[in-house]
Amino acid sequence: VLIANSRGGNAVRNYLQNGSGAGKVSHAILCGTPNHGVFADPKRAPNAEFNGAGAFLMGLNAPQGPNGDEVTPVVKWMTIRSDNNDKYAQPDGAWIGAKGMATHVTFEGPALKGAENVVIAGIDHRETAYSAKAFEAMFRFITGKPPVSLAVAPEASVVLDGKVSGYFAYAATGAVPTNLPLVGATVELYAIEPRTGERVGAAVHSKTIVADGAWGPFKADPQARYEFVLAAPGYATTHIYRSPFPRSSGIVNLRVEKILDADKDAAAIVIMTRPRGYFGLPRDSISLDGKNPPGVPSGVAGVASSKLKLGEAASRPVLGTFNDERLIGRSWPVANNELSYLELTY
């Protein structure tokens, strides 16, 4: 079974149609994949991977079999899409840097003839893969029955691990994030007080990163909130605050951050981020430090982080909320090359 989100679906389709994968895969699930492009214009970037009128996608979408399907035979296919809230399936080019341009792509762009095409109202581009409703659709498709529960089942013993990465410097584009181990970085974990974000005692875990990139394993208290403190030469000391972890995970990946030149005028920086989804207004109830989150527009959900620049350097609690999830962290002084992240789980 192969499950892919967004661009990953292009790789899955190419592997099954043009590689050797069709005989090895029973089910393929494409979540928010721009199967007909983020735009479709033969005169605009004709060789682009995301051009629905380009050679790559037209080749993948060429009719197959007696019904003219757009999917490789033998494999069972499902697509999951939003009704109208996927930033990359929009008739206007606003989310691809071309506001006012007709993309010639519709909300139905991720659907494929010959697949089971699932539409979930209101979900955003990332939630096509990472939401509970998307999981329910996937589970039914693979097993033929509904999941017993969509709630996260807690474990009595929780072990956490993941990789620590950083940035790679390109002369042309500047620093870009990588998934490569950041050897020599250090990680410390602190249990924190759930109302103030203050540390409770000494570090409960610490490690210097070696070639495998792993910062764990760490046996966590499933009721506790933790502050992850990352440091490495050439980087800012990065404080990441997380909600409790009810289950074990080996993919709690961490990245040491840098402070942008444009942000060095702030006394402190707190960024609330949602890696597994976007912020949508008025769809979601969101606040950062008791106010509307900066930089989150109304309409289609397409922004996954909100940056708060504080005028005071003194450390203090900062609360972030997203629907039912509540994150508490603390601010740290930019003058000491430090910044904070409130990373949402859901």
List each model region and its residues:
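Short, proline-enriched alpha-helix->beta-strand connector loops that line the catalytic pocket
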Residues: 71-76, 113-115
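Hydrophobic beta-strand segments
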Residues: 175-191
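Serine-dependent carboxylesterase/thioesterase catalytic core
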Residues: 1-72
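Acidic catalytic loop of the alpha/beta-hydrolase fold
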Residues: 36, 83-95, 125
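Catalytic histidine-centered segment of alpha/beta-hydrolase-like enzymes
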Residues: 122-131
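Beta-strand-rich domain onsets/edges
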Residues: 139-159
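Short beta-strand/loop motif that positions the catalytic acidic residue
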Residues: 79-81
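Preference for solvent-exposed, low-hydrophobicity sequence contexts
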Residues: 165-172, 189-346
